[in-house]
């Protein structure tokens, strides 16, 4: 049943590999992963260069500060969420990157490279084994690394499916405006 606001939760079981082999749509750098109830996204698991674990925590603080100083610093990426984890497997540390966003995979990764190249910043990915050293000028190599380390999900769920981050922000602004209007009427 449709709830208030016109949304209905949705789940999508994903085929092994992340997309239907009979419905492959090619992007600039390979198959386009489908939009799901959780929008677009990807998960990367890659081994970090030994001894670099502190760099990841410092980098997280840098992202926190950058967003606090300039809230729209990552806006071009159309992100909903990012989640980063470090974990050990047989004594080696791995990095897991999980991102949910509103653009397709190719656009997201191209935009990410452009943000870093324009700002002069480095990416925490430079601390991953096998990450291309020329990534700032070689978007295809960056994207190949991401695709090679992507671990497709096999289930995605959305409480408010297929809704963009911009739509959510607009709905929250509208709610605040209505609340303010009702307060003014009292």
Model-assigned labels for residue ranges:
Residues 1-94, 100-116, 131-186:
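Short S/T/G/P-rich N-terminal loop/turn motif that feeds into the first structured element of a domain
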Residues 117-131:
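Conserved His + Asp/Glu catalytic blocks
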């Amino acid at each position: 049943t449709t709830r208030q606001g016109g949304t209905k939760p949705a789940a999508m079981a994903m085929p092994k590999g992340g997309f239907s082999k009979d419905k492959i749509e090619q992007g600039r750098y390979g198959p386009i992963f489908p939009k799901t109830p959780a929008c677009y996204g990807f998960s990367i698991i890659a081994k970090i260069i030994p001894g670099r674990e502190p760099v990841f925590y410092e980098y997280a603080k840098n992202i926190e500060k950058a967003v606090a100083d300039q809230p729209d610093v990552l806006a071009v990426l159309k992100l909903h969420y990012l989640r980063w984890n470090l974990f050990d497997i047989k004594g080696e540390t791995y990095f897991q990157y999980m991102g949910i966003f509103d653009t397709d995979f190719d656009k997201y990764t191209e935009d990410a490279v452009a943000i870093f190249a324009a700002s002069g910043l480095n990416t925490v990915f430079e601390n991953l084994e096998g990450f291309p050293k020329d990534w700032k000028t070689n978007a295809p190599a960056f994207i190949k690394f991401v695709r090679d380390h992507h671990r497709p999900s096999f289930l995605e769920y959305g409480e408010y499916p297929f809704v963009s981050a911009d739509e959510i922000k607009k709905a929250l602004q509208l709610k605040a405006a209505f609340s303010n209007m009702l307060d003014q009427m009292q």
